[in-house]
Curated annotation (Swiss-Prot):
GO terms for cellular component: cytosol; small ribosomal subunit
Protein name: Small ribosomal subunit protein bS20
The entry's keywords: Ribonucleoprotein, Ribosomal protein, RNA-binding, rRNA-binding
Gene expressing this chain: rpsT
GO molecular function: small ribosomal subunit rRNA binding; structural constituent of ribosome
GO biological process: translation
Keyword rRNA-binding: yes
Family that this chain belongs to: Belongs to the bacterial ribosomal protein bS20 family.
The organism of origin for this protein: Lactococcus lactis subsp. lactis (strain IL1403)
One Pfam family here: Ribosomal_S20p
Listed transmembrane segments: none
Keyword Ribosomal protein on entry: yes
Function in brief: Binds directly to 16S ribosomal RNA.
Amino acid sequence: MANIKSAIKRAELNKVANERNAQQKSAMRTLIKKFEAAPTEELYRAASSSIDKAASKGLIHANKASRDKARLAAKLG
């Protein structure tokens, strides 16, 4: 456990950020699974948007976002 006050604060902030990131990644994965279960244009847009948001926030790498979107598009068409 950290002894320095700033390190204690950073540890708490890291914990909060980790929980938030996990929720956002989970939501993204859920949308992808919904699309894969029933590929529709509406679900594709939702999943694609979620992937873009995750990439812009640094949750996933930009190349992974591009790859995931391409795979979803292939399943759509």
